[in-house]
């Protein structure tokens, strides 16, 4: 039993290693485009270690990151950089994720990055949407190969946060 537990832990860590390394590789060869942001590390913890959690489902990872990044870009474009705008960006991201039933805690950091980094709408596409899409596809394939339960796009209507 302990061996199976340790094997599962290793496979979770190995999956995160592979995915983040690939994003890091893309990042190192494209100086004009960022592929990797810190919240993706936390997304991998959910997608690999607690893959059955509603917070780790593809819909939550993808749209949680996108909506949160959009929240940060919007607040920055309206208010600029201040401690109030940073707090408002995170608060708006949480509100939007809750309303859209796409709560993904790592995505809560995206507005901070967007506002403090003075990011524009391009930040939402690259690295956020592109990287989150890669993570979702990787998690679906990796978890399927390991015969783990992991929700796919066809399962979105059955998610607890989808109703």
Q: Language-model segments: what does each one mean?
A:
Residues 1-66, 70, 74, 79-87, ...:
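Alpha-helical transmembrane segments and their membrane-interface boundaries
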Residues 35-50, 90-120:
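Pore- and pathway-forming membrane helices of multi-pass small-molecule/ion transporters and channels
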């Amino acid at each position: 039993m302990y061996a199976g537990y340790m094997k599962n832990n290793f496979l979770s860590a190995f999956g995160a290693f592979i995915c983040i390394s690939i994003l890091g590789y893309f990042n190192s060869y494209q100086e004009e485009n960022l592929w990797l942001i810190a919240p993706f590390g936390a997304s991998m913890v959910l997608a690999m270690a607690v893959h059955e959690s509603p917070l780790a489902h593809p819909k939550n990872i993808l749209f949680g990151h996108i909506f949160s990044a959009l929240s940060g870009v919007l607040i920055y474009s309206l208010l600029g950089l201040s401690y109030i705008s940073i707090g408002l960006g995170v608060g708006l991201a949480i509100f939007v994720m809750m309303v859209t039933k796409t709560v993904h805690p790592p995505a809560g950091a995206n507005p901070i990055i967007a506002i403090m980094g003075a990011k524009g709408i391009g930040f939402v596409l690259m690295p956020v949407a592109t990287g989150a899409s890669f993570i979702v596809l990787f998690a679906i394939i990796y978890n399927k190969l390991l015969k783990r339960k992991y929700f796919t796009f066809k399962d979105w209507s059955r998610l607890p946060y989808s109703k």
